Amino acid sequence: MAGHSQFKNIMHKKGKQDAIRSKLFSKLAREITVAAKLGLPDPAMNARLRAAVLAARAENMPKDNIERAIKKASAADGENYDEVRYEGYAPGGVALIVEALTDNRNRTAGEVRSYFTKSGGSLAETGAVSFMFDHVGLIEFPASVASEEAMLEAAIEAGAEDVQSNEETHEIITSLESLRDVAQALETKFGEPRKASLIWKAQNAIAVDDEAGEKILRLVNLLEENDDVQNVYANFEVSDTLLAKLGD
């Protein structure tokens, strides 16, 4: 997952703080509401809603919050959110894709642009960097559900494209079209996954030094803290030393 997994782990550690966890729940609820509004309000019949609910459960979001977010989709006075994708460059020529759900495109665009500018990067046109990424499905299981060999065999048999396993997680990559079928096949065998959603996977990762890496991670942090930003993807790698420093 290149830079995506690296800074995702840092954000997870920082997410223990109550204020950040509250913001995370708000973002998860927004995605649940949007997913329910775009399709049926039943996770079993709505793949995007199911993915949103899985993500919420993985963060221990209370069941009541999840159900309230689903019901909000049918409320007459509910907010309407637009899905927006921003693309740009961070220091060192690193490419970033930012996905947002916003009720004010001008506000969000202005804020995202300011983050890039303050961090020494630049916001670009849509399509400027997405060709450096593959839009694919990602399924995650805890490492404890199966051995690396068993997961690899089951995933490939189900139609997955790649499997990456470590001490904590099995990450299964699928095509856009096969995500749902592969997820269902693996769930039958190993139980409910921790995640099953679409991501932007970098085709290649750029190795950056600690100075540039710190600037990039600062930009990612600014983006992640924005209420409208849902996901951030990048194509960089930093040293374990910097990760340990920022993860403390």
Curated annotation (Swiss-Prot):
Similarity comment: Belongs to the TACO1 family.
Query: Can you name one GO molecular function term for this protein?
Result: DNA binding
Q: Cross-referenced InterPro entries, in alphabetical order?
A: Integrase-like_N, TACO1_YebC-like_2nd/3rd_dom, TACO1_YebC_N, Transcrip_reg_TACO1-like, Transcrip_reg_TACO1-like_dom3, YebC-like
Q: Which GO terms describe its cellular component?
A: cytosol
Supply the name of the protein: Probable transcriptional regulatory protein Bind_0345
GO biological process terms on file? regulation of DNA-templated transcription
Q: What is the phylogenetic placement of the source species in the record?
A: Bacteria, Pseudomonadati, Pseudomonadota, Alphaproteobacteria, Hyphomicrobiales
Q: What is its main location?
A: cytoplasm
Q: Which PANTHER family match?
A: TRANSCRIPTIONAL REGULATORY PROTEIN YEBC-RELATED (PTHR12532:SF6), TRANSLATIONAL ACTIVATOR OF CYTOCHROME C OXIDASE 1 (PTHR12532)
Give the organism the record lists: Beijerinckia indica subsp. indica (strain ATCC 9039 / DSM 1715 / NCIMB 8712)
Question: Pfam families this protein is in?
Answer: TACO1_YebC_N, Transcrip_reg
- Superkingdom, natural source: Bacteria
Record's subcellular location: Cytoplasm
Key words of the record:
Cytoplasm, DNA-binding, Transcription, Transcription regulation
